[in-house]
From Swiss-Prot:
Disulfide bonds: none annotated. Its EC number is 2.3.2.29. InterPro entries: Acyl_CoA_acyltransferase (IPR016181), Asp_Glu_LeuTrfase (IPR017138), N-end_Aminoacyl_Trfase (IPR030700), N-end_Aminoacyl_Trfase_C (IPR007472), N-end_Aminoacyl_Trfase_N (IPR007471). Its main location: cytoplasm. The keyword Transferase applies. It is an enzyme of class 2 (transferase). This is Aspartate/glutamate leucyltransferase. GO terms for biological process: ubiquitin-dependent protein catabolic process via the N-end rule pathway. Functions in the N-end rule pathway of protein degradation where it conjugates Leu from its aminoacyl-tRNA to the N-termini of proteins containing an N-terminal aspartate or glutamate. The keyword Iron-sulfur does not apply.
Length: 258
């Protein structure tokens, strides 16, 4: 890659392929490389414009005649958990999240492998090896972190470090929020609703850091797999005219945002 292409991002368009979320539809993506000293700034800019990061690639849907994928970000400081979400927080009161550098471990891969085998055995990531997982974590030129969620030790004198690994989130730190790149959890702990818990924890972390948003990726109208992303309100959804606010369930407001 030349110095020019590092400083001036080049965008590419993928060929059509079957959509993994809406049966019978085709998807295309526009993408660019996140490399060089300005990768972090570019990642911030593109995330604000609806892109997502995967390793050193930033991409967003560019499908013909379909705009079902909508970028969403939770307004962290205004968010109030629902009754069901409060129950999930209580159910996981014994879980501690540990912020770590993006270093893959065999313990993480064991949980990752179990998660894929149980929840996404027919998905595009189903065949990922331990080396593929390491690349997913390490291949980044932006500020990214791992958060490991463990059962909290309860012994007297405990340092707070947890016991067995329950879940992991790979998270980018942006100038205006946290972007959840990928998360997974131990499928044997389904009753904990760890996917929801990790989102709630990220909202709390963003609030403590003074960051206004948590980026969740794409809410997809008509996709049961992605419907859950619309439950964290208030949030903003990216429209052609810019970010629009979707209010709490009791007000139903949609307001244009700057």
């Amino acid at each position: 890659m030349t110095q020019h292409s590092r400083d001036t991002p080049q965008f590419y368009l993928t060929a059509p392929s079957p959509c993994p979320y809406l049966p019978g539809r085709q998807e295309r993506k526009v993408f660019t490389h996140l490399v060089g000293p300005k990768a972090g700034d570019l990642n911030d800019l593109l995330t604000h414009g609806g892109f997502r990061r995967s390793q050193s690639i930033a991409y967003r849907p560019a499908c013909d005649q379909c705009r079902a994928c909508v970028s969403v970000r939770v307004v962290a400081n205004e968010f109030r958990p629902s009754r069901a979400q409060r129950k999930i927080l209580g159910r996981n009161a014994d879980v501690v999240g540990e912020l770590r550098s993006p270093v893959p471990t065999s313990e993480q891969y064991s949980v990752f492998r179990a998660y894929l085998d149980r929840r996404h055995r027919d998905g595009g990531m189903a065949d990922m090896t331990v080396l593929d997982y390491a690349m997913m974590v390490e291949d980044s030129h932006v500020k990214t972190r791992l958060i490991e969620y463990r059962r909290r030790k309860l012994e007297p004198g405990s340092t707070g470090r947890g016991e067995e690994l329950l879940a992991v989130a790979l998270t980018d730190v942006l100038n205006d929020g946290l972007s959840m790149v990928y998360s997974f959890f131990e499928p044997a702990e389904d009753r904990r609703s760890l996917g929801t818990f990790m989102i709630l924890d990220h909202i709390a972390r963003a609030r403590r850091l003074g960051l206004p948003y948590v980026y969740l990726g794409y809410w997809i109208d008509g996709s049961q797999k992605m419907d859950y992303k619309g439950r964290y309100l208030p949030q903003q959804r990216l429209a052609p005219s810019g970010w629009e606010r979707v209010g709490a369930e009791d007000d139903g407001l949609i307001e244009p945002q700057e």
